[in-house]
């Protein structure tokens, strides 16, 4: 049944307006963007098919135009609409961070890092540079590839911190496997960075490891004194 034939108030758009956006499932949210489905397939059913095809919403939104447009009923316009929605969310998170809310709202930091790093097919090691009031100066991706204790160079981190005149930092990296649990190598890297930053009187506030759906905080686990 097409969405236009659903009882009044039951379509995803009406549900959003009447009950709020948080009441919609992933498929219903995507259906609002798609607007229409295919013959014999509603927009919600099409959205559900797309999500399943890529193993989840994250996989779908990280897929290339070529991959997405192979699906029946999906062309460049629908792909562009999805990408625009993702980018708007990313820019809002970045704008909020730039307003200095990072430490007063830990969830904002997690959301920003999740948007930045969770969909990468390779490891990225990055740093949030903060001023003396813990406002964000800049987010910088420093290293890419296989991140281990040998591939992250404390001297490069220190050089960047001095260049930007940062007073404190939060480092972060992703696990493409989707599992956020820190490794022994992650803990070694953190200790080396903490010691290097102490030599220039800069605080390492946290090391966050980003997975598919969660972020592990070293500070919350008591691993950063």
Swiss-Prot record:
Keywords: Hydrolase, Metal-binding, Metalloprotease, Protease, Zinc
UniProt GO BP: proteolysis
Position of sequence motif JAMM motif: 173-186
Pfam families: RadC (PF04002), UPF0758_N (PF20582)
PROSITE patterns with a match to the protein in the record: MPN, UPF0758
InterPro entries attached to this UniProt entry: MPN (IPR037518), RadC_JAB (IPR025657), RuvA_2-like (IPR010994), UPF0758 (IPR001405), UPF0758_CS (IPR020891), UPF0758_N (IPR046778)
Domain MPN: 102-224
Binding site for Zn(2+): 173, 175, 186
GO MF: metal ion binding; metallopeptidase activity
Keyword Nucleus: no
Protein family membership: Belongs to the UPF0758 family.
Protein name: UPF0758 protein Shal_0429
Source organism: Shewanella halifaxensis (strain HAW-EB4)
């Amino acid at each position: 049944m097409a969405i236009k034939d659903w009882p009044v108030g039951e379509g995803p758009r009406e549900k959003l307006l009447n009950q709020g956006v948080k009441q919609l499932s992933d498929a219903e949210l995507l259906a609002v963007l798609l607007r229409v489905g295919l013959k014999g397939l509603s927009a919600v059913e099409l959205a559900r098919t797309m999500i399943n095809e890529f193993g989840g919403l994250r996989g779908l939104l990280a897929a290339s135009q070529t991959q997405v447009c192979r699906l029946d009923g999906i062309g460049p316009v629908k792909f562009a609409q999805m990408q625009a929605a993702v980018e708007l969310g990313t820019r809002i998170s970045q704008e909020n961070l730039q307003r200095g809310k990072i430490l007063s709202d830990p969830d904002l930091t997690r959301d920003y890092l999740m948007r930045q790093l969770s969909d990468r097919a390779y490891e990225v090691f990055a740093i949030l540079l903060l001023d003396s009031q813990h406002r964000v100066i800049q987010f910088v991706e420093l290293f890419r590839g296989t991140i281990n204790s040998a591939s992250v160079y404390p001297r490069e981190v220190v050089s960047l911190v001095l260049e930007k005149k940062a007073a404190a930092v939060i480092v972060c990296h992703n696990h493409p496997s989707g599992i956020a649990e820190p490794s022994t190598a992650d803990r070694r890297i953190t200790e080396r960075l903490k010691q290097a930053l102490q030599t220039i009187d800069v605080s390492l506030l946290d090391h966050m490891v980003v997975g598919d759906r969660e972020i592990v905080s070293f500070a919350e686990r008591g691993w950063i004194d």
